[in-house]
Amino acid sequence: MAVGRNNTIVTKFILLGLSDHPQMKIFLFMLFLGLYLLTLAWNLSLIALIKMDSHLHMPMYFFLSNLSFLDICYVSSTAPKMLSDIITEQKTISFVGCATQYFVFCGMGLTECFLLAAMAYDRYAAICNPLLYTVLISHTLCLKMVVGAYVGGFLSSFIETYSVYQHDFCGPYMINHFFCDLPPVLALSCSDTFTSEVVTFIVSVVVGIVSVLVVLISYGYIVAAVVKISSATGRTKAFSTCASHLTAVTLFYGSGFFMYMRPSSSYSLNRDKVVSIFYALVIPVVNPIIYSFRNKEIKNAMRKAMERDPGISHGGPFIFMTLG
């Protein structure tokens, strides 16, 4: 438990959410429920498809299935509570629950940073060293990179969470957000937040810069290798292979850097809520679309699954997304 002003024990916070207008509540609930269900349906479908089709048992799709799992956990750390708060008057969250929510949300996000870097290295190995690909990207190495991503992500998240939630907080303990994100929680602190801001910035820089450097170096080598390909068809195929990953990287890192790698004086809680919706709810639902829309192997795997079980064609929106 944290200590508030006058040595009172802080046991809970109140999440103000996005809007108090009754008409907006219904619209927001339907919108975010739809996004959450689509995220679950599309990512679970992608995981199941990769597991069922032996042609997709490759490092690239091993990483992709882990990314889908991460996105499910990532959005589930905030969406259920947010949906519950929209339709009920009980918008409180315990101090421990708030800290846990931020720890899981931050841990999943930082883990995704490392995983996207691992996926960039995988693309580098596949395009720049195709003959040595199975040697460079072995199953053991894939497991080590995924485990390392989780360890690095959640260790970094623990450091951030501890530095933030050790503060004294001022009443009335109202968080102007729909989940326990960093800026609105720090805004309630009665004590100096400089150290926490420095710690958070350092963690964000280390994780962000390291993972971005891996991505940039990998794609630097990829571009150098692709321009040497004499066939225009070969160049197009190589670039299209990387386009989906680059799109996902740009969306994720761009929104993350905007939120967490800037001075606290530039925070605008109302504006940041909109940005938070994008990286907390929208990115997890568009990732499977980005990776599947132009992926022939996933489309072929889906067609085979539909041929084996025609009932799959009525199984959800993922079918139309992959084959449309």
Swiss-Prot record:
Transmembrane domains' residue ranges: 27-47, 56-76, 101-121, 135-155, 198-218, 239-259, 273-293
InterPro entries named among the record's database cross-references: GPCR_Rhodpsn, GPCR_Rhodpsn_7TM, Olfact_rcpt, Olfactory_GPCR
Cytoplasmic topology ranges: 48-55, 122-134, 219-238, 294-324
Extracellular side: 1-26, 77-100, 156-197, 260-272
Origin: domain of life: Eukaryota
Predominant localisation class: membrane
Nucleotidyltransferase found in the keyword field: no
Topological category with respect to the lipid bilayer: Multi-pass membrane protein
A single GO molecular function term of this UniProt record: olfactory receptor activity
Disulfide pattern: 98-190
Gene3D superfamilies referenced in this protein's UniProt entry, alphabetically: Rhodopsin 7-helix transmembrane proteins (1.20.1070.10)
A GO CC annotation given for this chain: plasma membrane
Glycosylated residues, chain numbering: 6
Keywords from the UniProt entry: Cell membrane, Disulfide bond, G-protein coupled receptor, Glycoprotein, Membrane, Olfaction, Receptor, Sensory transduction, Transducer, Transmembrane, Transmembrane helix
Keyword Membrane: yes
Family annotation (PROSITE patterns): G_PROTEIN_RECEP_F1_1, G_PROTEIN_RECEP_F1_2
Subcellular location: Cell membrane
Family listed: Belongs to the G-protein coupled receptor 1 family.
Function per UniProt: Odorant receptor.
Protein name: Olfactory receptor 5A2
Organism: Homo sapiens
